[in-house]
């Protein structure tokens, strides 16, 4: 089965073609970072308009690169949620229109299920069951995964997601958008131990997260430095390192708890923040000590992309699931509500 996947949940337009027998045939992505950078964050209306502009050229590009024609496509998969409602509607409308024109079924895919399954595109994919850490700009969740659609939520952020905290913190200390890569870049030049930030909610039982207080702690630290006349680049680097270390160690502590609680040995990390090298290194070291294994997608499939949507959609289509012709999206959509495959 060949499935064309469309991703438009936020500020990246992604298109990919996945073959259930041959794997990923082609993928293309257009990022709107430059469009939104001047505003310091994503402007939903601008995101929707740019998806309209980019979608059809990217579909043509993927078909050309794969050597396929519309007659070779068996189905369309698209992100139906969660995400920005306008952006989701662009993708859903396009998917349903193309599916109707080509005479093939369409299926809406949960954006975070796409992220969760992205490591399945690698040469050595994880096997069920495993614990998944979903960590992105909109979500920070620990999930027990026993199969596709068989998800048990173990813990989640009660306020800001980790990726959101990275972006907001970067803005507070005068860095550009997107903040995650900027903080990681500065952290490489930071002085270890100059600042020590708290590890939120690690001094109590449970697997929930909280990052809003850490963001405030960072702001107060920066303001004290500025008031003391120390707003140097090195101080920014030191604060960036302290913040990143606090987030990473908090995630490590919770992941260790989740693995011990479930008795599982394999961990999947997925979502945009899973590209962070400090997080990857920390998890690899921890899983090595626990005689377990950590799995993640290649960096370009950690952020939003069409390949993960094509793959996830293909699995559900092979199980006989598909949508009717109505255009429907869910900006808020609990992953645990998905049917099992």
From Swiss-Prot:
One matching Pfam family: TsaD
Cofactor: Fe(2+)
Subcellular location(s) per record: Cytoplasm
SUPFAM superfamilies registered for this protein in UniProt: Actin-like ATPase domain
Cofactor binding mode and count: Binds 1 Fe(2+) ion per subunit.
InterPro entries xref list: ATPase_NBD (IPR043129), Gcp-like_dom (IPR000905), KAE1/TsaD (IPR017861), TsaD (IPR022450)
GO biological process terms held by the UniProt record: tRNA threonylcarbamoyladenosine modification
Coiled coil spans: none
Key words, A-Z: Acyltransferase, Cytoplasm, Iron, Metal-binding, Transferase, tRNA processing
Binding positions for Fe cation per the UniProt entry: 111, 115, 304
Superkingdom of the organism of origin: Bacteria
Primary enzyme class: transferase
GO cellular component: a single term: cytoplasm
Residues that coordinate or bind substrate: 134-138, 167, 180, 276
Predominant subcellular localization, coarse grouping: cytoplasm
EC number: 2.3.1.234
Annotated GO MF terms: iron ion binding; N(6)-L-threonylcarbamoyladenine synthase activity
Similarity comment: family membership: Belongs to the KAE1 / TsaD family.
Free-text function comment from the UniProt entry: Required for the formation of a threonylcarbamoyl group on adenosine at position 37 (t(6)A37) in tRNAs that read codons beginning with adenine. Is involved in the transfer of the threonylcarbamoyl moiety of threonylcarbamoyl-AMP (TC-AMP) to the N6 group of A37, together with TsaE and TsaB. TsaD likely plays a direct catalytic role in this reaction.
Protein name (record): tRNA N6-adenosine threonylcarbamoyltransferase
Annotated organism of origin: Pseudomonas aeruginosa (strain UCBPP-PA14)
Gene coding for it: tsaD
